[in-house]
Amino acid sequence: MAEKRNIFLVGPMGAGKSTIGRHLAQMLHLEFHDSDQEIEQRTGADIAWVFDVEGEEGFRRREAQVIADLSEKQGIVLATGGGSVQSKDIRNHLSARGIVVYLETTIDKQVARTQRDKRRPLLQVDDPREVLENLAEIRNPLYEEIADVIVKTDDQSAKIVANQIIEQLGF
């Protein structure tokens, strides 16, 4: 890989963006960033707190700034938040500044992977499956719109998925 290209991971919560991203960055000797972790570092608070205090709109503003800043770097793997693609500006940033990989997963897998995770504010409801289905209806077409590569993450280890991404990208 002569030039340092950015790889941006998009997909729903529970698709494995952070875990796969760490493996991918390590395998390609790139820097790894997670937009949610970056927001937590910058605010000194967890995502749930940001949602509680600033609402989803405040969180999305912070997320847009973090992604704009990080996507300026060269040679990174960035795991984005599941809802980040709802912003046209973010979609444009990602498409223009790197390779976008959509990590696709089923609602069943999302439910299984997120059911005990209290750090996901949008899922702290009586019926998280319904929330995930509604989000998928809105977001999946946006993931597909900007994806250079689509990789299914169901029933595969993060390492195998990272290898599939490398293979598909020809690195």
Swiss-Prot record:
InterPro entries documented for this protein: P-loop_NTPase, Shikimate/glucono_kinase, Shikimate_kinase/TSH1, Shikimate_kinase_CS
Assembly mode: Monomer.
Leading EC class: transferase
Protein species of origin: Shewanella baltica (strain OS155 / ATCC BAA-1091)
Residues involved in Mg(2+) binding: S18
Cofactor(s) in the UniProt record: Mg(2+)
Pathway(s) served: Metabolic intermediate biosynthesis; chorismate biosynthesis; chorismate from D-erythrose 4-phosphate and phosphoenolpyruvate: step 5/7
One GO cellular component term noted in the UniProt record for this chain: cytosol
Subcellular location: Cytoplasm
A GO molecular-function annotation: magnesium ion binding
One BP term from GO: aromatic amino acid family biosynthetic process
Similarity comment: Belongs to the shikimate kinase family.
Transmembrane parts of this sequence: none
Protein name: Shikimate kinase
Cofactor binding note from Swiss-Prot or TrEMBL: Binds 1 Mg(2+) ion per subunit.
Enzyme Commission number(s) of this protein: 2.7.1.71
Function (record text): Catalyzes the specific phosphorylation of the 3-hydroxyl group of shikimic acid using ATP as a cosubstrate.
Pfam families (UniProt xref): SKI
Record: residues binding substrate: D36, R60, G82, R139
Positions with a binding annotation for ATP: G14, A15, G16, K17, S18, T19, R120, Q156
Keywords carried by this UniProt record: Amino-acid biosynthesis, Aromatic amino acid biosynthesis, ATP-binding, Cytoplasm, Kinase, Magnesium, Metal-binding, Nucleotide-binding, Transferase
Record field: catalytic activity: shikimate + ATP = 3-phosphoshikimate + ADP + H(+)
UniProt key word Acetylation: no
PANTHER family documented for this protein: SHIKIMATE KINASE (PTHR21087), SHIKIMATE KINASE 1, CHLOROPLASTIC (PTHR21087:SF16)
